[in-house]
Amino acid sequence: MCIRDRDNTHVVEPKYPGVVEQYINLGKCYDHNGMEGLRTAIISCMRGYKGHYQRAYRCLDAAAELMYDVRSTLDSDALEEKLSKRARGILDRELKPRKGAPAGTVKQRFLGAVTHRGQMCLWGTVECQCQRIYELSDRYGLAHRMLAHLLSGALKAGYDVVACPSPMAPDRLEHLLIPQLSLAFLSSSPAHPYPGKAYRRLLLDNAVSADLLRRSRPRLRFSQKITSALMDEAVDSLSQAKAMHDDLEALYHPYVNFELVDETALAIAAELSLL
């Protein structure tokens, strides 16, 4: 059983409406006559906040492309081997196989996000579950390779893990938590440093070929400068979108019958209790 909030930023269409899924029409809770005088203001706010969201997404997409370019610039077989070797050493030291245990399981959870308040990461959530923290100092977005090896090794050793994808590239790992061992691997960067005291700190940048890094430095500086500017623009657009969305809610709020909303919720709860 799942109840989904369907709005313009979370559009989910039913596959089998009427037999598996059904719509819940909260539009019936509006005072349509009272809202008629707000038509122009509502349309203006609706268009405005959508426009800010679209601009934010364009900036984030562009920033993600530049991040990919940085990673591609530094990628090499030698880098892969160095990170793989480092991961194997950690696995041998920290993740001893559990005798007789089945393979571990994976839960995926986002630990960070880009919001109207800026880039955020719930470091405190990690510290509530894990006391030993490996900080992967990662200026160029290289942590995924090491984390992928650690994830695979942890599962084979019989440990359950929480894999935390990057909000900028959800197909790439950014953090890895192993609560059974009170152990976490967190990637950090100058733009988003880990504020706590790490059990160990690994400098992933040192795995890059010094010659390649030297030759690529102007390109890397340019990409990171533009990426930072794009992220700032995205956050600014999200902030403006949030402000306009708040204005939109303020327009609607006096014309919503919240008693009817509550009645609808109670009716749904009664249906669920019969399942």
Feature names for model-found ranges:
Residues 1-3:
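Short, small-residue-biased leader/transition segments that mark boundaries at the very start
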Residues 7-12, 187-192:
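Short, polar loop motifs at secondary-structure junctions
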Residues 18-61, 197-244:
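A glycine- and Lys/Arg-enriched "phosphate-lid" helix/loop adjacent to the NTP-binding pocket
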Residues 59, 63-94, 251-275:
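Intrinsic-disorder/low-complexity recognition with aromatic hotspots
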Residues 91-125:
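N-terminal pre-Walker A segment at the start of P-loop NTPase domains
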Residues 120, 128-154:
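Glycine-rich phosphate-binding P-loop
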Residues 156-171:
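Short beta-strand-centered segment that lines the nucleotide-binding/catalytic pocket of NTP-utilizing
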Residues 166, 175-178, 190:
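Divalent-cation
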